[in-house]
Amino acid sequence: MTQRTLVLLKPDAVRRGLIGEIVGRIERKADWRITALELRTLDHGTLEQHYGEHKGRPFYEPLMEFMQSGPVVALVAEGERVIEGVRTLAGPTDPIAAAPGSIRGDFGTITRENLIHASDSEESAERELKLFFPGLS
């Protein structure tokens, strides 16, 4: 079944020049396609909506600060099982636990600055795509 998912390349990925490498890995995997891509600086309101479920947790404020520290790449990936697949390609949040060959395993340095966000379910993908790409049908 063809799916769509939101992927964010976080400020550390942009700062380190990893956009092409990460986008290439997504495109090469299982014939997935990038159907929208924007470089943007996220405002506090958008981030609050996106990460609202984490408000009050110890990592929330540092995460909000980090995500506003520079531009991000927001993109839409489409393909068979792309939601599960991009998360697997990204690897676990902790780069030490991430296997070589995964994005975080190959390029990750610390848990908080972990290069990439990918929707974790069809429901999350739908909500996140509406937030980041409201004009998408």
UniProtKB/Swiss-Prot annotation:
Localization of this protein: Cytoplasm
GO cellular component: cytoplasm
Entry's Gene Ontology molecular function annotations: ATP binding; metal ion binding; nucleoside diphosphate kinase activity
Catalytic reaction equation(s): a 2'-deoxyribonucleoside 5'-diphosphate + ATP = a 2'-deoxyribonucleoside 5'-triphosphate + ADP; a ribonucleoside 5'-diphosphate + ATP = a ribonucleoside 5'-triphosphate + ADP
PANTHER family linked to this entry: NUCLEOSIDE DIPHOSPHATE KINASE
Complex formation: Homotetramer.
Record family assignment: Belongs to the NDK family.
Protein name in the entry: Nucleoside diphosphate kinase
Native source organism of the sequence: Streptomyces griseus subsp. griseus (strain JCM 4626 / CBS 651.72 / NBRC 13350 / KCC S-0626 / ISP 5235)
Gene name in the database record: ndk
